[in-house]
Regions:
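A metal-dependent, Asp-based hydrolase signature
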Residues: 30, 42-99
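Basic, amphipathic juxtamembrane/active-site segments
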Residues: 20-33
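Asp-based, Mg2+/Mn2+-dependent phosphohydrolase catalytic module
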Residues: 1-5, 15-19, 36-43, 116, ...
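Short, acidic loop-to-helix structural element flanking the phosphoryl-transfer center
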Residues: 66-74, 91, 102-130, 141, ...
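Short, solvent-exposed amphipathic alpha-helices that sit
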Residues: 28, 75, 139, 143
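Short amphipathic alpha-helical segments at helix boundaries and their inter-helical linkers
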Residues: 53-67, 103-113, 202, 206
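Short, acidic, Ser/Thr-enriched surface-loop or helix-capping motifs
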Residues: 8
């Protein structure tokens, strides 16, 4: 029986399309920065952003985790800082810039059909719900709030907070330890065969794999060994299968 259901977010509960390469995004960000006294051209801003990402990744590679995660706010901090400023001087603008970028680069974001009803049913059945997602808090938390699902979860664990991402077992373990979760009575639900199935099994979790429109392309060639396997996103069926499997 499953007492705890751990969900991935994007591609599992949330359907999203983003495009950070679109030059229109960078034109928009140049206009945003210009309003705050920071001047860029679109190509130059995009190049500097990528350069700061690489630097952050190189710095994190020296950390203890096998799959480290950067903190995107530190990237936007470097883009936002003016001469003679300290990070605290531009903290609010850094957050605003990051969130403006996320909105500008998002083509659409929505819940898959039936997600709210599923979460409600699982709660009514006495299940404890959690999130474990490779995501940046400055982007994701406002999205979770705007989609109206924040209140269903006992804990929302995001990779940017911990400094490591799935498939790192340490990222899983910190959620289990903090919430005193028994993996034998818990299931991980996600759309990535490596991050959400193989990695979850390493820490003793049961698994539900759902193939979605943003699952990794090479998942189609993998021999996926999950307790529940879904070939497409069908949230009512997902809910039924989880509850059915939980009661065995």
């Amino acid at each position: 029986m499953y007492d705890n259901i751990i969900f991935d977010l994007y591609g599992t509960l949330i359907d999203i399309h983003t495009d950070e390469e679109d030059i229109a995004v960078w034109k928009h960000m140049c206009e945003f920065y210009a309003q705050h006294g920071v001047k860029y051209n679109p190509a130059g801003l995009r190049s500097r952003y990528k350069r700061q990402i690489r630097r952050a990744e190189q710095a994190m590679a020296k950390k203890r985790f096998k799959f480290p995660e950067i903190q995107i706010l530190e990237v936007f901090e470097q883009l936002t800082l003016k001469k003679d400023q300290t990070p605290s001087d531009c903290a609010e603008l850094t957050v605003a810039a990051a969130q403006e970028f996320r909105k500008a680069s998002t083509g659409y974001i929505r819940l898959y059909d039936g997600v709210t009803d599923m979460l409600e049913q699982l709660k009514q059945a006495g299940k404890k719900l959690y999130v474990l997602s490779n995501a940046q808090r400055v982007f994701t938390f406002p999205e979770v709030q705007s989609l109206g699902i924040e209140g269903y979860f006992k804990d929302i664990s995001l990779s940017s907070d911990f400094g490591a991402m799935k498939p790192d077992a340490a990222f899983y373990q910190q959620l289990l330890d903090r919430n005193h979760i028994n993996p034998n009575r818990s299931i991980m639900v996600g759309n990535d065969a490596v991050c959400d199935v193989l990695a979850a099994k390493q820490v003793g979790l049961h698994t539900c794999y759902v193939h979605s429109n943003i699952s990794p392309v090479d998942d189609a060639d993998r021999d996926i060994k999950a307790d529940i396997i879904m070939d497409e996103v069908n949230v009512p069926e997902m809910c039924r299968l989880i509850l059915e499997d939980a009661d065995r």
